[in-house]
């Protein structure tokens, strides 16, 4: 009788988990979920550096998890807004950073013929070091604003649940503050307040071992790239992007490879030099998987985790898209 009861209980639990997974929908948002946009500037007094940020605030008033986003080379806080809008509609405070020195100020006042040269020069070690220090500076200021009654962010932030994300140079920034070890020097810029990370167009180090760079990462990472994700600047090609996943050993890891997706797939518009037509389903997949990841690891949503750790993500993908995951 006891054995029969145990079997029935396990069957019921499996059925319940399956039902929760099948009903979970990372794309579902309410009609009243349009976020409020707040533009602010973080002043880093120690470095005398001003950092513009754009905050997508959800309609809820309770403290919500925070997701940071770092733009690619030449971008701004206004880029990839389709992500910020959706994440906020799902209940996250999405904070989009702008990094002076590697933002649109690099190219916008130059003749077209000079822009590529200027962008290449901005993809520098100096700007990398500025970026990885921008992230903790922003988190520090968010902690202050969260306690200031005069701030539009007062009481709105759950800073015990912080996700980090970024595209291209922003992915490099994300990797550095989320557990990467610099392959040559062994230096780390990890911010322990970050609990999960998404790298859009991740990169292996130019020199040194990817295994050394990523082998000690101990928080969940989601990696997204495309089969034609080659950056116009730098040496990051598809094999170097795929090497990141293989090098992660200690924490849950996920990888999406979108078929025929180019480097611009994670932005709002095509880039000069793109050869493939934009696939509208790519943004749907990006939003679904990133949201499920945040729900699982920032929202502690068991149904989202079960959905993510199953074949359900393939229901939003096209046949040739690739998906894999592992939990050590």
Predicted regions and their residues:
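Serine-hydrolase catalytic machinery in alpha/beta-hydrolase-like enzymes
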Residues: 47-157
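Primarily recognizes the serine-hydrolase "nucleophile elbow" in alpha/beta-hydrolase
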Residues: 138-216
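Alpha/beta-hydrolase-fold serine-hydrolase catalytic core, especially in secreted/extracellular enzymes
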Residues: 259-328
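Active-site rim elements
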Residues: 121-126, 208-210, 273-284
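N-terminal signal peptide c-region/cleavage motif recognized by signal peptidases
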Residues: 14-16
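N-terminal cap/lid segment of alpha/beta-hydrolase-fold proteins
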Residues: 20-62
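Glycine-rich His-Gly loop
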Residues: 69-73, 167-168, 202, 226-227
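The feature captures the conserved acid-bearing segment of alpha/beta-hydrolase catalytic domains
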Residues: 186-260
